[in-house]
């Protein structure tokens, strides 16, 4: 994921926290805010020191970024997302992280549904 698609500034985080909607599951909390006219979504990641050491926190962030990269075509491009990892995410592998993110994004109805080919 390109750096220009990441939320880094505290003001941008606060704007999404204040004005955005949130939804969660056991592993992640996702805040989303619609940005009109944007041609690509932006994500901000937050992994607390309570989750684990730096290696663990960075691994979780890599997994989240890669999951968003793989789901890029299904994600609404006009939104900004903040993903906050919770403690259970520390013990998950990549596939579990991706599955959990798909679940929480479906709960928030920000993930486009795949076309159903069965009749």
From Swiss-Prot:
The chemistry this enzyme catalyses reads: Endonucleolytic cleavage of RNA, removing 5'-extranucleotides from tRNA precursor
Extract the Gene3D superfamilies matched here.
3.30.230.10
GO cellular component, alphabetical, reads: ribonuclease P complex
Q: What are the GO MF terms of this UniProt record? A: 3'-tRNA processing endoribonuclease activity; ribonuclease P activity; tRNA binding
Matching entries from InterPro entries are given as:
Ribosomal_Su5_D2-typ_SF, Ribsml_uS5_D2-typ_fold_subgr, RNase_P, RNase_P_CS
Q: Which GO terms describe its biological process?
A: tRNA 3'-end processing; tRNA 5'-leader removal
Q: Which keywords label this protein?
A: Endonuclease, Hydrolase, Nuclease, RNA-binding, tRNA processing
EC number(s) recorded for this UniProt protein: 3.1.26.5
Entry's Pfam families? Ribonuclease_P
Family assignment from sequence similarity: Belongs to the RnpA family.
Q: How does it assemble?
A: Consists of a catalytic RNA component (M1 or rnpB) and a protein subunit.
What role does this protein play? RNaseP catalyzes the removal of the 5'-leader sequence from pre-tRNA to produce the mature 5'-terminus. It can also cleave other RNA substrates such as 4.5S RNA. The protein component plays an auxiliary but essential role in vivo by binding to the 5'-leader sequence and broadening the substrate specificity of the ribozyme.
HAMAP family, sorted: RNase_P
The name under which this protein is listed is: Ribonuclease P protein component
The primary gene name is rnpA
């Amino acid at each position: 994921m390109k750096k220009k698609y990441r939320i880094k500034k505290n003001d941008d985080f606060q704007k999404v926290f204040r004005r955005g909607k949130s939804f969660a599951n056991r592993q992640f909390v996702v805040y989303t805010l619609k940005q009109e006219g944007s041609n690509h979504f932006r994500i901000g990641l937050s992994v607390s020191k309570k989750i684990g050491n730096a290696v663990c926190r960075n691994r979780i962030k890599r997994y989240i970024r890669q999951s968003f990269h793989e789901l890029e075509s299904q994600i609404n491009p006009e939104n900004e997302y903040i993903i906050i990892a919770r403690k259970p995410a520390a013990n998950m592998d990549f596939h579990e992280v991706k599955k959990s993110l798909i679940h929480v994004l479906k709960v928030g109805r920000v993930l486009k549904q795949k076309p159903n080919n069965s009749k």
